Curated annotation (Swiss-Prot):
Name of the protein this chain belongs to: Dehydratase asqC
Molecular function per GO: lyase activity
PANTHER family per the UniProt record, alphabetical: ATTH DOMAIN-CONTAINING PROTEIN-RELATED, TERPENE CYCLASE ASQC
InterPro entries named among the record's database cross-references: AttH-like_dom_sf, AttH_dom, Fungal_Dehydratase/Hydratase
Record organism: Emericella nidulans (strain FGSC A4 / ATCC 38163 / CBS 112.46 / NRRL 194 / M139) (Aspergillus nidulans)
C-alpha cells in the first residue's frame, strides 16, 4: 500500500517566512576523472563548437535570512536566440522577470573564456580556464538584477548516464552541476541583497543537440536528507510536427557519492490544478505525481506559486514556465521531501 503523500514544504501559507534547507555540496575532487562513461569532456562543451542552452536555477539565502529563487537561461540553438531571468521572493511570493530576444552571442574559443548572452550584462561568463568550474551569471535589467558567481563544488549529473539521450526523434546532450557554492548579490526594489554562500546553491545545466520534442516538462530536484539529485524528463511530439513516438518519461538519479542511475518513471499531471495564462492562452499544470519504481519512490511535486511564467513578445521565441517547486512523499521506501525547479515549454 502506498503511504499518504506528505505535505511539508507544499503547504506553507503564502505569507510564511521561508526556511528551506538550502546548502551547496562540498565536493573538491577532479572532474577530469569522474569515473563515468561520458562521451565528451565537460570543458570542451563550453566552447563555440557547441551552441544550445546555458541555464541556472539558484536557491538563495541572503545574509539577513531572506530566501529567493533565481533563474538565468540563455538559448542560442540556431532557431531561438533569447535570454530569460527571474527572481521569486520565497516569503512574499512576488515574481519578477526579464525577457530579451535577439542579438545574442557566445564565444569561448581557447584560450578565451566563455561569454554567452544577450546584450550587456545578461548571460554567462566562464571565470576559470576550463570555463565551468567557476562561472559568473548576470542579469542587468531594472526589473531583474543580480550578479552571481558559482563554483563547481558538486559532483556532476550526467544525463542518461553517459550524457546523451533521445528526446523525441533526435539526440540531445545534457550535463549538470546540481549544487554549486554560490556568492554575489541580488537587487530587489532599491535594496542590494548580499548572499550567504553557506545557505545557497546553484544548479548549472548545459544542453545542446537537435531534440525532437514539441512540448516538455523538466525537473531538477534535490533531496537534502539523502544527497540525491534528480533530472526528470517528460515530453511528447505532436503527430503533425513529426512522426509519432513513444512519449519521453525517464529520470537520471545521482546519489551522494556521484553514482548515476537512469530510471523509467510514471508521470501524472494534476489537470485540476493549473495556471492559465491570458497572454499566451496556454495552461500550465502546477502539481504532478512522479513514481520511480526502481527507487520505491512516489512523490507529489507542487509549484510554490501559480504564475512563474517568463514570456516575451510572443513571436518566434517560446515562453517558458521556470518555477520553484517543492515535493514530498516516499523515496527508497522512506518519507522524504525536497525542492527544485520545473521548466514547462510548449513550442
Amino acid at each position: 500500500m502506498r503511504p499518504a503523500i506528505l505535505a511539508a514544504f507544499s503547504t506553507l501559507p503564502a505569507a510564511a517566512k521561508a526556511t528551506y534547507p538550502f546548502a551547496p555540496e562540498t565536493f573538491d575532487g577532479s572532474y577530469k576523472d569522474i569515473g563515468l562513461p561520458t562521451i565528451y569532456d565537460l570543458s570542451a562543451t563550453q566552447s563555440t563548437n557547441y551552441n544550445g542552452s546555458w541555464a541556472t536555477g539558484s536557491w538563495i539565502t541572503s545574509v539577513s535570512g531572506g530566501q529567493y529563487f533565481v533563474v538565468s537561461h540563455y538559448v542560442n540553438d540556431g532557431i531561438h536566440d533569447v535570454y530569460r531571468s527571474s527572481i521569486l521572493d520565497l516569503s512574499s511570493l512576488k515574481y519578477r522577470y526579464f525577457f530579451q530576444a535577439g542579438n545574442g552571442s557566445y564565444t569561448a574559443s581557447p584560450p578565451s573564456h566563455l561569454k554567452a548572452g544577450v546584450g550587456k550584462g545578461n548571460g554567462f561568463e566562464g571565470i576559470s580556464n576550463d570555463n565551468y568550474t567557476t562561472m559568473r551569471v548576470q542579469s542587468s535589467h531594472p526589473n531583474v538584477t543580480f550578479d552571481l558567481t558559482y563554483h563547481a563544488t558538486t559532483k556532476p549529473l550526467i544525463n542518461g548516464g553517459a550524457g546523451v539521450v533521445m528526446l523525441g526523434a533526435s539526440e540531445s546532450k545534457q550535463w549538470s552541476l546540481p549544487a554549486c557554492w554560490t556568492n554575489g548579490f541580488l537587487i530587489v526594489g532599491d535594496e542590494q541583497i548580499p548572499i550567504d554562500p553557506k545557505r545557497s546553491l546553484t544548479w548549472y545545466d548545459r544542453q545542446w543537440g537537435t531534440g525532437g520534442l514539441t512540448n516538455w516538462t523538466w525537473y531538477g530536484l534535490h533531496i537534502p536528507k539523502t544527497g540525491h539529485v534528480l533530472s526528470i524528463w517528460t515530453g511528447d511530439t505532436d503527430a503533425d510536427r513529426a512522426a509519432p513516438i513513444t512519449p519521453v518519461r525517464f529520470a537520471t538519479v545521482r546519489n551522494a557519492y556521484g553514482a548515476q542511475t537512469v530510471c523509467n518513471i510514471t508521470w501524472i499531471p494534476d489537470l485540476s490544478h493549473i495556471f492559465h495564462s491570458d497572454s499566451t492562452n496556454k495552461s500550465y499544470p502546477l502539481a504532478w505525481t512522479v513514481e520511480i519504481p526502481s527507487y520505491d519512490a512516489i512523490i507529489k511535486v507542487k509549484s510554490r506559486t501559480e504564475n512563474q511564467l517568463n514570456t516575451g513578445s510572443h513571436g518566434s521565441e517560446p515562453e517558458a514556465y521556470n518555477g520553484f517547486v517543492t515535493f514530498a512523499g516516499q523515496f527508497q521506501g522512506t518519507e522524504t521531501e525536497g525542492f527544485g525547479i520545473v521548466e514547462i515549454v510548449y513550442l
